Regions:
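Conserved beta-strand-loop-beta-strand hairpin that lines the nucleotide-binding pocket
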Residues: 1-9, 52-126
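STAS-typified acidic loop motif
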Residues: 7-19
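Residue-level detection of beta-strand scaffold positions
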Residues: 19, 23, 120-122
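Conserved short strand/loop->alpha-helix "switch" segment adjacent to the catalytic nucleotide/phosphoryl-transfer site
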Residues: 21-45
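Histidine-centered phosphotransfer motif of kinases
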Residues: 39-57
Length: 126
């Protein structure tokens, strides 16, 4: 994790390209152990995709990403200024959603106004 000091941040236009752009952005800037890297990149991609699908917004609006080193791991936050998170939706085979975040992160949560979903991944692989 030594290619950045304590935090990274970026914004991506709310288009179908945003999840891929966020994955490439993080991979290019954070040297993470393989197991941690894969989990963090997949979780980030899913949350950015959720912003694209569910925020009710489109480009030129943006989704914001922040990554912070914390003792023993990483804290990642994805923010959009969309409609917020309501009741959970039924499982759909083509959408992993917050269930994926719940199973693959070590801790996670959300707040609305603006919509802010965060997760933490500990330094070792899960």
């Amino acid at each position: 994790m030594d290619r950045f000091s304590d935090e990274l941040s970026a914004s991506f236009p709310l288009t179908e390209l945003a999840p891929s752009a966020a994955r490439h952005w993080l991979s290019a800037r954070a040297a993470l152990p393989v197991g941690v890297h894969d989990r963090v990149v997949l979780l980030l991609s899913e949350l950015v995709a959720n912003s694209v699908r569910h925020s009710g917004l489109a480009a030129p609006e943006e989704v914001e990403v922040e990554v912070h080193k914390i003792p023993g791991g990483l804290y990642v936050e994805v923010v959009d200024h969309g409609v917020g998170i309501g009741d959970p939706v039924p499982f759909k085979p083509d959408h992993f959603g917050l269930r994926f975040v719940d199973t693959q992160s070590d801790r996670w949560g959300f707040r609305n106004d603006p919509t802010r979903v965060w997760f933490e991944v500990d330094g070792g692989s899960r």
